[in-house]
Amino acid sequence: MNLFAVSFFGHRQVDNPFLIERQLESIIRELLLTKEYVEFLVGRDGEFDLLVSSTVRRCKRTIRDDNSSLVLVLPYMTAEYRNNEESFHEYYDEIEICLESAEKHFKSAHQVRNRSMVDQSDLVI
């Protein structure tokens, strides 16, 4: 199987969410229809990340859901995840804790996690 990995990075606050959502939807639709299998790698650190995740979920539901996975990549084990693990697993297809960043100081963990996501991606948005 040909895996196509996509990472998303954006701002904590989004000024025009409807415009961003439409642009994301167009890209995600194209990927779902043209790639054998797509792995959508996302964080959970702001409005953009949440917008991406909800758009991927909606596109999977309305376009195609048999050739992709929505993967939350955490920089380290968080209290939010630990206290809500079941809810996280209901929302995301997979959850990964980046081993490289989990071993780093928390102030640099996001940067290390982001670099790891980029390194495993075929496309970065």
Q: Can you describe what each PLM-predicted range is?
A:
Residues M1-I125:
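Acidic/glycine-enriched connector segments
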